[in-house]
Amino acid sequence: MRSFMVSRGCPYKCAYCFNHKYNMLYKGLGPLHQRMSVGRVIAELRDLKARYPTQFIKFYDDIFVLKDDEWLDEFSERYPAEVGVPFHCLMRANLLTESVLLKLKKAGLASLSMSIESGDDHVRNNVLKRNMSRKTLKDAFALCASHDIPTFSNTIYGVPGTTLDQDIGSLDLNIECGVTFGEFPLFFPYPRTELAAYAMEQGAFDGDFDSLHMSYQAGSPLKCFSKREKMRQKNLSLLSTVCLMIPALRPLVVNILIHLPLSGLYFYLYYIVKAYIIKTRIYPMKLSLKDALRSIWESFTLERFKHTEEAFKQALGGERRR
């Protein structure tokens, strides 16, 4: 799989993202969103294919399509004819129409990312600044399902001022939307973002960014949650991915499993489900046995680090000793 970007910039102001600060830096110096011509995209991707074996493209643009326009028309015609590699891209649910989805599918869309972020309307729209209704989210995911496009969603747990019940409500919205695969990271206060400032104003974070884990999946760094609450958040984060694959497990997960000190076991369940869904539905590729084993080992090692606080402490200790 190769990662690629055709544009830069995002006009939206999600509170957890750097883009609103980035846009302020370049205000008045040009359009917020800039995109390559289709011709240049095709030329670069053809060169990529000529240089390296390429089975799949992941377009990492913040939003791959902002509107149904001539660029998308040209892309949907030329990409399958001149590149012909299945791809994944990121969209906002409020921008997805049937016309846009059909053009992307014609081009070779294999799966699509659309973030939900929270099942609570107040948190999603007033705290995270997503400005999206439940109906908009449900309609967008239903549209993908109707055209057999697997979906990948992100949802944030442990936002300052929220409860475990609200996080469970976020899981429920993912299940209602029929999300194929989802990640449920815990809130992480990135420096100079609006949400980090909000966490400090709430007294939930002391502003010591250097003490944070490198990964937003290791555990909540906030002071407003007890140790037991953080354990439940982490367990729910891991098991929510499993619930999307097997929704019938939801009652067992939220009523019993998240309350048990078994995060280590739940990590393995999470990893198995993630590895299976990612490789078969989200980024489907054919790998040799050697490449498959290498991929499993590398991804497992990375996931274990991202979800383990102790690994970071050891790395940090090594840095300080040097």
Model-derived features: positions:
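Aromatic- and acidic-residue-enriched segments that line the glycan-binding/catalytic groove
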Residues: T193-D208
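Histidine/acidic-residue-rich catalytic or RNA/ligand-binding cores of hydrolases
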Residues: L72, D167, A196
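Radical SAM enzyme core and accessory elements
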Residues: G28-P31, R46, E194-A197, H213-R322
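Conserved strand-turn element in the central/C-terminal portion of the radical SAM core barrel
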Residues: F64, R92, E117-R124, L128, ...
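Glycine-rich, positively charged active-site loop/lid region within alpha/beta enzyme cores that binds
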Residues: Y16-K21, A204-S211
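Catalytic cores of alpha/beta
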Residues: V100, P160-E176
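Radical SAM [4Fe-4S] cluster-binding motif and immediate context
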Residues: M1-F152, D172
